[in-house]
């Protein structure tokens, strides 16, 4: 049996301000830092250890991972950063207040954008400064690979190839893996590992800074799933 640990980043500044974040690179709050440290303490107290780590290229997930590893005295562990573990891209909603957006477009429409499986928010227009095209961390990616908006389905479609290419082979080789990422990219992994339906995964909540543990058999099928 192998244990895989997933952790959503600690509370971010835009989580606190109730803004759509997506690919916007925002900092952790003091609470978010405390959540990450507490996660490391829980993992350490429960006897967890790791051989390899994965995270996105967004600093709220990177810093959460670093804080967890620092608390566990494991900052030396190898870490792979990949854009495919980024949060779902929220398109034209990024930077907008969720309550104000609901007042403008209607609660039902915003709920569809946020919680439907295959309906994305409005895309960012060409030339918008929020587009990731000129960002160095995405150098080498084609314009087609970089989203202007994403549904959860789109997010899952980029997360799963990374799982199969980079994470699953490490687990099969006996490595203990920790993944620090985002609510929707982690939903993609949960949907795949647990075999959840589109309806089930859109309602599955992953709190900030709380480790989600999978116990996997030799075929990487889950035998248990629980929050620490």
From Swiss-Prot:
Cite the binding residues for substrate: 8-15, 21-22, 60, 87-90, 98, 114-115, 183-184
Keyword line: Gluconeogenesis, Glycolysis, Isomerase
Annotated GO MF terms: phosphoglycerate mutase activity
Q: What is its EC number?
A: 5.4.2.11
Indicate yes or no for the key word Translocase.
no
Q: Which positions form S-S bridges?
A: none
Query: What reaction does this enzyme carry out catalytically?
Result: (2R)-2-phosphoglycerate = (2R)-3-phosphoglycerate
- UniProt key word Isomerase: yes
Marked site, Transition state stabilizer, at 182
PROSITE patterns per the record? Answer: PG_MUTASE
Coiled-coil intervals, chain numbering: none
Report the enzyme's class at the first EC level: isomerase
Regarding protein family, the annotation reads: Belongs to the phosphoglycerate mutase family. BPG-dependent PGAM subfamily.
Q: What does this protein do?
A: Catalyzes the interconversion of 2-phosphoglycerate and 3-phosphoglycerate.
The protein here is known as: 2,3-bisphosphoglycerate-dependent phosphoglycerate mutase
- Species annotation: Rhodospirillum centenum (strain ATCC 51521 / SW)
What does the organism's lineage look like at the top? Answer: Bacteria, Pseudomonadati, Pseudomonadota, Alphaproteobacteria, Rhodospirillales
């Amino acid at each position: 049996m192998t244990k895989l640990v997933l952790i959503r980043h600690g509370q971010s500044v835009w989580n606190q301000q109730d803004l759509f974040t997506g690919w916007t690179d925002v900092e952790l709050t003091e609470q978010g830092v405390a959540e990450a440290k507490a996660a490391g303490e829980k993992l350490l107290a429960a006897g967890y250890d790791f051989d390899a780590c994965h995270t996105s290229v967004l600093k709220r997930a990177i810093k959460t991972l670093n804080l967890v590893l620092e608390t566990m005295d494991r900052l030396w562990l190898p870490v792979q950063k990949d854009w495919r573990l980024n949060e779902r891209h929220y398109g034209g909603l990024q930077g907008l207040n969720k309550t104000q957006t609901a007042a403008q477009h209607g609660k039902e429409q915003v709920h569809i954008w946020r919680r439907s499986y295959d309906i994305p928010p409005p895309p960012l227009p060409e030339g918008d400064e929020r587009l990731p095209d000129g960002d160095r961390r995405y150098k080498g990616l084609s314009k087609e690979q970089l989203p202007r908006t994403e549904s959860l389905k789109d997010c899952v479609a980029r997360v799963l190839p990374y799982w199969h290419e980079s994470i699953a082979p490490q687990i099969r080789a006996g490595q203990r893996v920790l993944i620090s990422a985002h609510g929707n990219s982690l939903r993609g992994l949960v949907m795949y590992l647990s075999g959840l339906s589109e309806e089930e995964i859109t309602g599955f909540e992953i709190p900030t800074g709380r480790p989600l543990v999978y116990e996997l058999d030799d075929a990487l099928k889950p035998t248990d799933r629980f929050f620490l």
